[in-house]
């Protein structure tokens, strides 16, 4: 239910090969000032073939996402991929805060 709600309230991008989904990403945005890029995923056996690059280019060039002041994302291992598209480390991380409810999905 939580996954479906997150998809329903996001701009979602899928990558398909022979009718099988091999990639996904979603953007949470107000379409005016800010966007959060999240849940970028390519199935393991398709990685290393430029699919993630194509997906990021597609998202960054999507007409409704042009002119935003700020994009943000969290990534554990793809910093170099995003740097190719102009992403940088947060200039002043001391200004950023988060509220992380680690138990929100527990029942």
Predicted regions and their residues:
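A conserved beta-strand-loop-helix scaffold within acyl/acetyltransferase catalytic domains
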Residues: 2-42
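Hydrophobic alpha-helical segments of small multi-pass membrane proteins
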Residues: 42, 55, 74-77
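Short loop segments at secondary-structure junctions
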Residues: 18-19, 45-46, 60, 100-103
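Conserved acetyl-CoA pyrophosphate-binding loop and the N-cap/start of the following alpha-helix
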Residues: 46-55
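Intrinsically disordered, low-complexity, positively biased terminal segments
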Residues: 43, 57-66, 107
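Short amphipathic alpha-helix that is part of the acyltransferase structural core
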Residues: 1, 16, 93, 106-107
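Conserved active-site alpha-helix within GNAT-family acetyltransferase domains
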Residues: 65-72, 76-101
């Amino acid at each position: 239910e939580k996954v479906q709600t997150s998809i329903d309230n996001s701009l979602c991008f899928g990558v398909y090969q022979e009718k099988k989904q091999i990639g996904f990403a979603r953007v949470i945005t107000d379409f005016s000032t800010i966007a959060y890029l999240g849940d970028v995923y390519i199935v393991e056996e398709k990685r290393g073939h430029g699919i993630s690059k194509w997906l990021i280019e597609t998202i960054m060039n999507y007409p409704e996402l042009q002119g935003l002041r700020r994009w943000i994302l969290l990534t554990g291992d793809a910093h170099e991929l995003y740097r190719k598209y102009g992403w940088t480390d947060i200039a002043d991380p001391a200004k950023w805060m988060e509220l992380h409810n680690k138990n929100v999905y527990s029942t």
